[in-house]
């Protein structure tokens, strides 16, 4: 999951922030 989150974050930092929020 970490790898997926890392890729998603790098591709879409906004989406990552939303996921974490």
Curated annotation (Swiss-Prot):
Membrane topology of this protein: Multi-pass membrane protein
Subcellular location: Cell inner membrane; Secreted
Top-rank taxon: Bacteria
Coiled coil (UniProt feature): none
Disulfide bonding pattern of the chain: none
Region annotation Disordered: where it falls in the sequence: 1-21
Annotated GO CC locations: extracellular region; plasma membrane
Key words of the record: Cell inner membrane, Cell membrane, Conjugation, Membrane, Plasmid, Secreted
Proregion positions: 1-21
InterPro entries: TraA (IPR008873)
Family, similarity comment: Belongs to the TraA family.
Description of how the protein assembles with itself and partners: Monomer. Interacts with itself to form filaments; also interacts with TraQ.
UniProt function note: Propilin is the precursor of the pilus subunit, pilin, that forms conjugative pili, the filamentous surface appendages required for cell-to-cell contact during the earlier stages of bacterial conjugation, and that retract after contact is established. Mature pilin is assembled with the help of TraQ and TraX.
Protein name (record): Pilin
Native source species: Escherichia coli
Lineage, top ranks: Bacteria, Pseudomonadati, Pseudomonadota, Gammaproteobacteria, Enterobacterales
